[in-house]
Regions:
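Membrane-embedded helix-loop-helix hairpins and adjacent transmembrane boundary segments
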Residues: 1-436
Length: 436
């Protein structure tokens, strides 16, 4: 996402690709204000997944299953994005055809099947150090070799002037709304994924979450510098057929071979570790909130581990299918597709942490979830997996992130169904206990 997909989008369209920066800025207050509340509930009740928290609040197995299913499905295109990151690096090393993608899939599958979560945990620190070294060298030395940031922006400006259309160093007026809604929708979705919530549930305390959130804006600065690699490619005279190849091509052109190899290793490991954590998080969600309650209630911990390994492999295969059969214009579109789905769990997970949950019952939230999932999926596939849908109203065109559109539809349907069900009525035992 950070090193391959974002610079690729910036290289292709310019300023529009920087929506990832306000998105990461908006994430921080969400983490600071909402996630500590979720941790407190989870810690008190023994919840380890979002679906656990939903069942504990509303006492509804169907709603629990809906949240779990969404987490598994939405993770697949996100893992697909990581596979693409590994693929472009392997391709830059000389492999051609489908071999880079096949190699990326095999490496990921073998990496996690044998060692599980221990594998990414062991090298996560090394991965972070390698990525920081590559990024710091890139954002300092690359502009220096190209004549400074002034020259970088000048070359990018000239290149976008030739391209024309909705590209450039600044946003076009028609891009304001989609840019804003992409940022808002992505921020709401970010910490609904199984792998991000795993980190929340594993925190030592609510204060730990808040303290970590304070330092998260540093990532936004880093992301902005990395995104500029897309502009630097124009200054270096880089031309690629596939936008995803722009960063490897830039490194190949400007760095000595030994550092290029180090950088490619960092990018590959930087994709491998989160992909592994994502697949394991989705597998654990499936095992705990579907397999155990519906298929094997008496399953042992060892049995759950075996099932999770198989499901983790299936999730990776699903990610591969997304790449092969749902080609997108930009790699980032895959992550945004996952966002369309996972953000539909936001009302069920978050409303339950505040008094607003007393105004919604499980059937209303489930109806809203179904409406958001169906509506969002239909819009996404009707638009060719493009993340933004354009509405024509009163002669004007309004382009909005499909995930946010579906979330609005979700909440509206939930409100309508709740009104049809009548006022709050009788609480479920689980809801009454949680409220107390």
């Amino acid at each position: 996402y950070t090193v391959i997909a974002v610079p690729a989008l910036v290289y292709a369209v310019g300023a529009y690709g920087f929506f990832a920066l306000p998105y990461t800025i908006l994430v921080y207050p969400i983490v600071f204000l909402i996630m500590p509340k979720l941790w407190k509930v989870a810690h008190a009740k023994g919840h380890v997944t979002a679906a656990d928290a939903v069942y504990g609040r509303y006492g509804s197995r169907p709603l629990e299953f809906a949240v779990a299913l969404t987490g598994v499905v939405a993770t697949m295109p996100y893992i697909a994005l990581q596979l693409i990151g590994m693929e472009v690096v392997i391709k830059a090393l000389g492999l051609t055809g489908e071999l880079p993608l096949a190699a990326a899939f095999v490496i990921l599958a073998l990496y996690t099947y044998s060692a599980g979560l221990r594998a990414p945990a062991l090298i996560a620190f090394v991965k972070d150090i390698m990525i920081y070294i590559v990024v710091l060298v890139a954002v300092v030395l690359v502009p220096a070799k190209l004549g400074g940031y002034g020259a970088v922006f000048a070359h990018a400006h000239d290149a976008f002037a030739v391209k024309g259309g909705a590209t450039g160093l600044t946003l076009k007026p028609a891009q304001f709304l989609p840019f804003a809604t992409l940022a808002i929708g992505s921020a709401l979705a970010a910490f609904m994924y199984p792998h991000t919530l795993t980190g929340i549930f594993a925190a030592r305390s609510a204060d730990t979450i808040r303290k970590n959130a304070v330092f998260l804006p540093a990532y936004t600065v880093l992301l902005g510098l990395i995104a500029l690699l897309g502009f630097m490619a124009y200054a270096a005279g880089i031309s690629v057929k596939n936008n995803n190849d722009v960063v490897p091509a830039l490194f190949n052109a400007l760095f000595p071979s030994w550092f290029t190899g180090f950088a490619f290793s960092a990018i590959a490991i930087g994709a491998l570790v989160p992909a592994a954590v994502m697949s394991i998080g989705a597998a654990n969600l499936f095992t705990r909130n579907f397999w155990k309650p519906y298929v094997a209630p008496d399953i042992t911990a060892a049995g759950q581990e075996k099932v999770a390994k198989v499901v983790s492999l299936i999730v990776k295969a699903g990610a591969l299918i997304f790449i092969l059969f749902l080609p997108t214009k930009f790699a980032l579109d895959l992550q945004l597709l996952g966002g369309v789905w996972i953000v539909q769990t936001f009302p069920s997970v978050v409303f339950g942490l505040f008094n607003i949950s007393n105004r919604f019952r499980a059937p209303a939230l489930l109806a809203g979830w179904a409406a958001g999932m169906i509506g969002g999926s239909w819009l996404a596939f009707a638009d060719g997996i493009k993340p933004v849908h354009t509405f024509v109203i009163g002669g004007g065109s309004y382009a909005i992130y499909t995930g946010l559109t579906a979330l609005i539809f979700n909440v509206v349907v939930a409100v309508v169904v709740q009104l049809l069900l009548g006022k709050r009525g009788e609480e479920t035992p689980a809801l009454r206990q949680s409220a107390g």
